[in-house]
Amino acid sequence: MTQQTSQKHNPVLVVDFGAQYAQLIARRVREANIYSEVVPHTATVEEIKAKNPAALILSGGPSSVYADGAPSLDPQVLELGIPVFGICYGFQAMTHALGGTVANTGNREYGRTEMTVDGGILHADLEETHKVWMSHGDAVSVAPEGFVVTAHSEGAPVAAFECAEKRMAGVQYHPEVLHSPHGQEVMVRFLTEIAGLEQNWTAANIAEELIDAVCAQVGPEGRAICGLSGGVDSAVAAALVQRAIGDRLTCVFVDHGLLRAGEREQVQTDFVAATGAKLVTVDEREAFLNKLAGVTEPEAKRKAIGAEFIRSFERAVAGILDDAPEGSTVDFLVQGTLYPDVVESGGGSGTANIKSHHNVGGLPDDVEFQLVEPLRLLFKDEVRAVGRELGLPEEIVNRQPFPGPGLGIRIIGEVTEERLETLRAADLIARTELTAAGLDSEIWQCPVVLLADVRSVGVQGDGRTYGHPIVLRPVSSEDAMTADWTRLPYDVLEKISTRITNEVSDVNRVVLDCTSKPPGTIEWE
């Protein structure tokens, strides 16, 4: 699928110099309806050429170009004839490689900064003086030969430059963040007016191309199974593959006992009604609980759940083949892996492995299926757009994300049936009250976490109790790469807390997780 997409859309490559916003830059490019991918700064010139990029964007980073071991830009990259846009550290690395001057001016700029426009294409028709988001110590003091300085600030004599002839430009500030109000306009101007790219990355053609890619991978006679988790990702992946190969796809819903209240029934009704897909439900609750017995380490949990998913599918294949023509096999496994999953699992050289995603790093080495991952290069909002393009109802498309490992990674400690019942009850109360308050559209998701290995002292019924705390983790996000905690109304929080402590046994405390991502991931495990 990756090759198929790359052939039709030469990517804008975001070269990651260690920036926390590299994925956000890629998102902003896609918001401009242009396809993008992230590559590490360690990518060689030959590796970059092999991707046939439409343009390069050099990300920010925490280093100084003069520091020992600082990531550098191979000057040959700038000789490929590819449009290049530098941001913050990428702007300085670009300047350094082209023979300009980067200096420590002693005037650092962090946060909102007033910048003055001196002309050029990038900032045409914008206010002469406006706010941008800066985060730098060093600054470009002399632009490379042939480049026109188009903006400055108090701490950055060269806050932006461009060379239309070479199709290169750069800015010292961060146009990708919302704190730079005109940042997206500036990025679009580079992409369209300086780089000359077409804006043709849309939900309609994404869906069409992904369907074609699945057809090419599975072939005219291949059969596939798809594991449904109850979430939007697996639902859209299944709908795409069904559109490609029809009844040669069988969807398998594994009831692993790690589901929320009503999850199984909802999948069996909503998804089948929306797609008409063949659905087989298998009860594997006992197998999963046995596999998780005694497991407390988060990474071990994810890998155990991922491995048992595969074993469950293998056990389901025999039943599926009973209805297939004699001699048929099932060779393909469809998964709803997304681009953030790949990135967080260390998707590429030089990329940190934050945690194994059950679809990426949590699979056993002896998988008997070929993986079909039609959403592997998409962000969550793109998945929703493709789902709508395929005609899936809003009840499925707008569903809040729910991880494949389910409640198993929302119990801090060993997973037991008793603890699952406790968490399931608390989760249902939280979801019910958020829906009743009309807040579903305002939050990305609200994981409810049981601190099963923690005992909290409480007073209930005039007596001392030692119960478990429940954590509410409401977050707002665009794509799960970054997230902020959602400021829920106090009265809603109070109602959720009161109901949980009154109605859920062995829980005597409810706490709010107000950590953004970064530093914390959305899920606790």
From Swiss-Prot:
The active site is at residues 88, 174, 176. Pathway: Purine metabolism; GMP biosynthesis; GMP from XMP (L-Gln route): step 1/1. Its EC number is 6.3.5.2. Keywords: ATP-binding, Glutamine amidotransferase, GMP biosynthesis, Ligase, Nucleotide-binding, Purine biosynthesis. One of its GO terms (cellular component) is cytosol. Pfam families: GATase, GMP_synt_C, NAD_synthase. ATP binds at residues 229-235. Residues 201-399 form the GMPS ATP-PPase domain. InterPro entries: Class_I_gatase-like, GATASE, GMP_synth_C, GMP_synth_GATase, GMP_synthase, GMPS_ATP_PPase_dom, NAD/GMP_synthase, Rossmann-like_a/b/a_fold. CDD domains: GATase1_GMP_Synthase (cd01742), GMP_synthase_C (cd01997). GO terms for molecular function: ATP binding; GMP synthase activity. It is an enzyme of class 6 (ligase). It comes from the Bacteria. It catalyses: XMP + L-glutamine + ATP + H2O = GMP + L-glutamate + AMP + diphosphate + 2 H(+). Residues 11-200 form the Glutamine amidotransferase type-1 domain. Homodimer. Catalyzes the synthesis of GMP from XMP. This is GMP synthase [glutamine-hydrolyzing]. It comes from Corynebacterium diphtheriae (strain ATCC 700971 / NCTC 13129 / Biotype gravis).
